[in-house]
């Protein structure tokens, strides 16, 4: 912590390869709205010293602790803030373009995705200043919001059963985490609030 902010990569720059890591909650979260602001710093370390600055907000984190655990990722990466990554067997239903790389669209066919990256809608991030991220978790649905704009929605979130990995089960809760992936980043004003029964949890302009 530094001046009330979470400061990731507060270490000297080095030519030696550094391990990735994360900061995880102890409790599980469900049916809530999570807000946090982030801003990039200047430091980068090997192996990401020449790549886009990268971090992430992971949610519905279930299973053993490891890098890239069973979870979904609200991508925090230069030019890609709001992308969704499906990690370690997680799968969703969402609206995507039917040609080329999977890309979320506001109106389109529903399709089940079970691996890799889904590109966010639009580009609303500030490369040089503070950005506000909102993650809305509503039962087995999730919404990514960047600076007040909806960029990703997911329905029917599922993960493999612990007893039988070939069987998928609905997921509506899990831990959250912030990633450290070789780039300096500050997070501030982290808030987590329950969704009220009368609230429209997916509302944003």
Label for each model-derived stretch:
Residues 1-205:
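Carbohydrate-interacting regions of secretory-pathway proteins
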């Amino acid at each position: 912590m530094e001046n009330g902010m979470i400061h990731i990569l507060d270490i000297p720059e080095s030519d030696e390869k550094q391990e990735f890591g994360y900061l995880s909650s102890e409790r599980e979260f469900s049916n809530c709205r999570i807000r946090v602001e982030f801003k990039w710093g200047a430091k980068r370390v090997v192996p990401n010293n020449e790549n886009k600055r990268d971090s992430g907000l992971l949610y519905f984190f279930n299973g053993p602790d490891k890098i890239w655990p069973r979870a979904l990722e609200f991508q925090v990466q230069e030019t890609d803030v709001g992308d969704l990554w499906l990690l370690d067997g997680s799968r969703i239903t969402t609206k995507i373009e039917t040609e080329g790389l999977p890309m979320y669209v506001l109106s389109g066919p529903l399709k089940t995705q079970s691996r890799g990256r889904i590109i966010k809608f639009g580009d609303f991030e500030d490369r040089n200043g503070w950005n506000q991220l909102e993650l809305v978790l509503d039962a087995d649905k999730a919404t990514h919001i960047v600076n007040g704009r909806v960029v990703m929605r997911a329905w029917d979130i599922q993960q493999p059963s612990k007893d039988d990995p070939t069987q998928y089960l609905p997921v509506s809760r899990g831990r959250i985490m912030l990633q450290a992936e070789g780039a300096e980043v500050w997070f501030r004003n982290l808030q987590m609030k329950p969704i009220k029964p009368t609230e429209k949890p997916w509302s944003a302009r």
